Structures are given as structure tokens and as C-alpha cells.
Amino acid sequence: MLGPDNAFWDDGEWVSWNDINRQIQYKEWGAKYPNADRSLIPIFEDLLSVAEDYHDTTGSHLQVYGDIGELFGAITYGVKLHRNYAQGSDGRLGDDFVEVKTITPFKSNDYVEVKASGNFSKLLVVKINQHFELSCRMISRKNLPKAKGGKHRINWLEIA
């Protein structure tokens, strides 16, 4: 029930503070993630929070970092994700197929490997550090190092 404890009267109706806070949050997301499908942002934030809380509570990691990386690519670059387990790439950005690889907080090095046979023209590498802060870098396939054993191996520091 809306009333003076959780809302204010404006133009003949009650307006809840929750509605105002949601609108403010929506605007802040727009400023932080201008390319995002904003409906994905709360899912991304909740999933990241659950992963961090689980790690803080148990000392173990959930197997969700790939999904977190893909969602981060969707909200930071506007990558349109394919259905789960689609072969060759994780999504599209305009006319480019994008493969997303995630460096997890527990990984001992900052390398990712991607199959040379994959159907992608851009590689997005998302790094989640031990404090669960994210950053990402994108590289064109033509700028990847030469493949060895059917895989490209890319160091985070080598991506411009």
C-alpha cells in the first residue's frame, strides 16, 4: 500500500520511492553502459554478486565466469549474444562475429586460448580480477598471434 511512509503525493497520485530509485538506477546504467541492453544489467550485476558472495563464503568458485564475461561484453560493447552453446562464436557486433574469452579471478596467468577454426572476426577478452572487478579488451582476428596446434594463445598485456 502506497502512503506517506514509502511514497509522495504528486499530481493527484502516489509515486513510490522504489519507482523513483529504479528510474535513477536506469539512468545511471545508461551513463555507465551506453551500448547495453539495459534489461541484462541487473542479471549481470546479480550473477557477479552471487559469484563473489559464494567465493567469500566458501573459498570456492562457481562455474559462471564465462557467462559473466559474455554478459559484460553484451552490456559494455552491445554484443548481441547467440543462444547457449552455439558453435564458432558467442555473439555479433554489427557484421562481426565475436568470441568472448574470460580470464577468471583464480587463473594463475593472463593468457586465453581460442580455436583457430572458430567462426569469429573479433575476440573480446574479459578479465575478472581477485576483487571481482572487470575490464575487457577487443582484438581483431587478423591481429591475433599465429596459431600453434590449432589455437591462438593471447596474453592480456598484448591486447591494445
Where are these regions (language model features)?
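Nucleic-acid endonuclease domains
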Residues: 1-160
